[in-house]
């Protein structure tokens, strides 16, 4: 029996409502593979993004919590606990690697090759950068370096298209600037470049805020607020590095909200 595209989309929406995101991913993977040389609709594209974002987000949160506990146990000298925690962290890292490999293959094999508009190209290249960045968050040594290089290439390719094809107020262009700046700050340890990129994107969007359409006003202004929040946080940390240490356990950066 042939798998029906509309049925898969419906089941993905149902899975989203039930907060069963692993199943939502599976349904949207079917859709992406069904379309062959066609492009996903904006709705399908957003469903795919939301599905993977939730699946990866839960594991990223777990990894951060486990890593924080590991550091505390190390500081106490509880070597036996540390060994158990490291083993458990490896399980989460394997899950993270598998999820990232899944979406990156889908992007390279189906989604990026069929993208025909500037908007969809930026969307998928940004997504590619995001999932390589998630790998760079927990990988070490040569693997981390490779993930960071792939992230930079994807974000730069997306940025080149966004600067030409999308207005400064476009939520996808703003989301790209937000996540690219987080990459500079968190992975490349370059707060100056992170702040420059975030400030430039914010200032360019503010200058054209009057021309912003009603349909994207909410998304665009939300991401602009996130850019400003990061700028405030990063600037204060650069002026007083010790301030960042006082926020133990807090997420030190914010990323874009999905549609």
From Swiss-Prot:
Query: What superkingdom does the record give?
Result: Eukaryota
Put simply, this protein is called 14-3-3-like protein
Question: Which species is listed as the source?
Answer: Chlamydomonas reinhardtii
Q: Where is the composition biased (Basic and acidic residues)?
A: 244-259
Region of interest: Disordered: 238-259
Which PANTHER family does its entry note? 14-3-3 PROTEIN
Protein family membership: Belongs to the 14-3-3 family.
Pfam families under this entry?
14-3-3
